[in-house]
Regions:
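Phosphate/NTP-binding elements of NTP-utilizing enzymes
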Residues: 1-169
Length: 169
């Protein structure tokens, strides 16, 4: 509920669990220590992206460490950061206090970690950093580049964290 509250205060579309009670299950699952990966399947416009950002906010508050938000393209990444993610972070007093600086490809956090903002179209971004928590958005729009699958490359970034890593997609 605290994560949903952060999204609601962001000024964007509210994450209303009274209207979309089915989102509570994946949010609760993500917050359980024993759960490593949550896969959310659903139709268009049911709140999957808001759910993803609520889990990102919860992770910032309760799981310090490097995070990665994976998007299909640079354009979608830039649009989402400006229209959804940044307003959510600025709209929550708890999350706003954690942010040190916004950059094009990452958000620096005051605890010395970051939220890496990666795209599926860049093999170098998919292979350049190890992350504790991975947030995969719009994976059905990922284009295969080269021999590898963008989703598998992104998931591979969490391998060093073993059973402590978390993925939501």
């Amino acid at each position: 509920d605290r994560a949903a509250e952060a999204v609601q205060k962001s000024g964007g579309s509210p994450l209303r669990l009274d209207v979309s009670p089915f989102l509570r299950g994946p949010m609760d699952a993500y917050s359980r220590p024993s759960v490593r990966e949550v896969v959310v399947c659903g139709s268009l416009q049911v709140g999957k992206t808001l759910l993803l950002y609520a889990c990102l906010g919860w992770s910032m508050d309760y799981r310090p460490g490097i995070k990665m938000l994976a998007m299909p393209t640079r354009e979608s990444r830039d649009r989402v950061v400006e229209k959804k993610l940044r307003p959510m972070l600025q709209g929550s007093p708890v999350l706003r206090r954690m942010v040190a600086k916004y950059r094009r490809e990452k958000i620096l956090l005051k605890d010395g970690t970051s939220i890496e903002l990666a795209t599926a179209e860049s093999p170098s971004q998919r292979a350049s950093i190890t992350v504790q928590d991975l947030f995969v958005d719009e994976e059905d729009l990922y284009s295969r580049s080269g021999d590898s699958s963008p989703l598998e490359d992104f998931k591979g970034r969490t391998r060093s964290y073993g059973d402590f890593a978390k993925i939501i997609r």
